[in-house]
Amino acid sequence: MAEVQKDAPIKSVQVEALVVMKIVKHCSTSFPTVATGSIVGMDNNGAIEVTNSFQFPSVDVSSSDSHSDASSLAAAAPRAKANIVYQNEMIRHLKEVNVDANNVGWYTSATMGNFINMSFIENQYHYQKENEKTVALVHDVSRSSQGALSLRAFKLSPEFMTAYKEAKFTTESLRNSKLTYKDIFVELPVNVHNSHLLTSFLHQIPAPPKSAEIPMPASLDDIRRDPVQIPAHPGFESLDLSIDPFLEKTCDLLLDSIESHYTDLNNHQYYQRQLTREQFKITQWQAKRKAENAARLAAKQSPLPEDEWQRLFKLPQEPSRLEGMLNARQVDQYARQVDAFTANITAKMFAVRGNLLPE
C-alpha cells in the first residue's frame, strides 16, 4: 500500500492562502521583471500540498543594462548554482524549526500568459529530473489585476521529458513519438486552502442582509424614522463600448508569436531545400560512379568504392523543432485568452450593430 501511495501520480496542487499572498506580493512588487522563487511542502497521496515559499535572491543589475537582461537573469534564477545552494540552506533552516521543508517545485510570474519559453522548460526540467513530483506555479500579474486570481500549476509530460533528455526534436523523432505542442505540459488543478482557525473566523463575519422587497413608507415620519437605504445597483461601466486594453495587448502578443512561428517555419523550409539539393548532388554522383564502375568492369579493372560520397558531401543538420513547438503552444495560449476576452466585446458589438441597422 505504501508503494502505491509513493508512486501515485500528481492529481492536484493545494496551496496555502498565506503562500498565495506571498507569491502575489513578490510578483507584484517585481513587476514587470520576472519574479521567481521556491515552494516547499509535501506529497499527500497524489496531492502536492504547498505550505511555504521563499523568493530567490535578487540580482543587482546596473542602470546601463536593459530590462530584458534583468528579466533573463531572474528567469534563470531557479537553476543557478548560487540559488541552488541558497535553496538547500533555506530548506535546512526550515527543517530545524519543524516546518514541512520538502522541495515541491518553484514559482514564476507572467504577463498576459507569456511564460512558455526555453527558460521555463529548462527550469522545470531541472526540478523534475531530480524529483518527478515537482510543479511550477505561474502567477499572471496582468490577469490578476482585473480582480480574479490567476494561479496555475504545470508539469512537463513524461513524453516530453524523455524527448528533452535525449535532445531529439527532429521531424522523424516527433513523428515516431507522436509528440505535439499539446503534449508539452500537464496542467493541474489548483486549490487554495485555509487553516481551520481562519475558516472559523470567516464564518463568524456577519453576512450582509438578504435582499428583499423594501416596504414603501406611509408617511414622512416613517422616512425620518427609518430612512431607506439605496440598494446596490449595477453601474453603466458594463455598457462601455471601448475595447478591452488586455484584449488589444493579447492580440499584439498573438501576432508576435505567429510571426515567430513563421520565422521558424521558414528556417525549416530552408533546411529542406538545402537537404533536397545535397541529396540530388549525391544521387548524381552515385549514378556517375556506377557508370564508371560499369566501364571499369568492362575493361577488367577493379571498381571504385561507391561509398566515397560520405566523405565528399555533407548533409545539412536539421534544426531543432523545439522552438516551433513552444511557439505553437504559446499561440494556442494567446488564442484561448482572446476567446475569453471577446465574449463580452462580441455581445456589445452585436448590440451596437443591431441598433445601427435600418428597420
Curated annotation (Swiss-Prot):
Gene Ontology cellular-component terms for this entry are: eukaryotic 43S preinitiation complex; eukaryotic 48S preinitiation complex; eukaryotic translation initiation factor 3 complex
* Record-level Gene Ontology MF annotations: metallopeptidase activity; translation initiation factor activity
Protein keywords: Cytoplasm, Initiation factor, Protein biosynthesis
Among InterPro entries, the record links this protein to: eIF3h, eIF3h_C, JAMM/MPN+_dom, JAMM_MPN+_peptidase_M67A, MPN
Is Cytoplasm set as a keyword in this record? yes
Q: Where is the MPN domain?
A: 13-160
Which compartments does it reside in?
A: Cytoplasm
CDD domains documented for this protein: MPN_eIF3h
Q: What is its main location?
A: cytoplasm
* Biological process, per Gene Ontology: formation of cytoplasmic translation initiation complex; translational initiation
Coiled-coil ranges (or none): none
Specify the superkingdom: Eukaryota
**Keyword Protein biosynthesis attached:** yes
According to its UniProt entry, what is the function of this protein? Component of the eukaryotic translation initiation factor 3 (eIF-3) complex, which is involved in protein synthesis of a specialized repertoire of mRNAs and, together with other initiation factors, stimulates binding of mRNA and methionyl-tRNAi to the 40S ribosome. The eIF-3 complex specifically targets and initiates translation of a subset of mRNAs involved in cell proliferation.
How this chain assembles, per its entry, is:
Component of the eukaryotic translation initiation factor 3 (eIF-3) complex.
HAMAP family noted in UniProt: eIF3h (MF_03007)
- Into which family does the record put it? Belongs to the eIF-3 subunit H family.
Q: Which named protein is this?
A: Eukaryotic translation initiation factor 3 subunit H
- Supply the source organism for this entry: Neurospora crassa (strain ATCC 24698 / 74-OR23-1A / CBS 708.71 / DSM 1257 / FGSC 987)
Upper lineage is: Eukaryota, Fungi, Dikarya, Ascomycota, Pezizomycotina
Q: Which gene encodes it?
A: eif3h
